[in-house]
Amino acid sequence: MKKRGGRILWLVYLDSTIPKSRGRIIAKGVAVPKPTIQEVEEALRRLGYSYESYPEKKYPPLWFEERARGYFLVKSDEKPASIAAKVAEEIRRIRGQ
């Protein structure tokens, strides 16, 4: 999703424990289990993206689940799936997987 000159990256997009039918946008093998706001923020920083963080917001289709909390507005023209795959890969490096 594009918003105010950037791309929205919900934590749900990266979460391997959430099925694609509920919001994940990258392959399960690429996604990471239960990413945190801090991990995604660190990954975006390491990858050199400019971003804004909205940790209190909930992914509308999963408003009732705590793990669906938080999104980032990434200043980029790349597709969200491309950004999500890079961030997931960086989170794997951070976790040492």
Swiss-Prot record:
Pfam families found in the cross-reference section: SRP19
Subcellular location per the Swiss-Prot or TrEMBL entry: Cytoplasm
GO aspect biological process, one term: SRP-dependent cotranslational protein targeting to membrane
The keyword NADP appears for this protein: no
GO MF, any single term: 7S RNA binding
Ranges annotated as spanning the membrane: none
Family, similarity comment: Belongs to the SRP19 family.
Descriptive protein name: Signal recognition particle 19 kDa protein
Species the sequence originates in: Pyrobaculum calidifontis (strain DSM 21063 / JCM 11548 / VA1)
Gene (name only): srp19
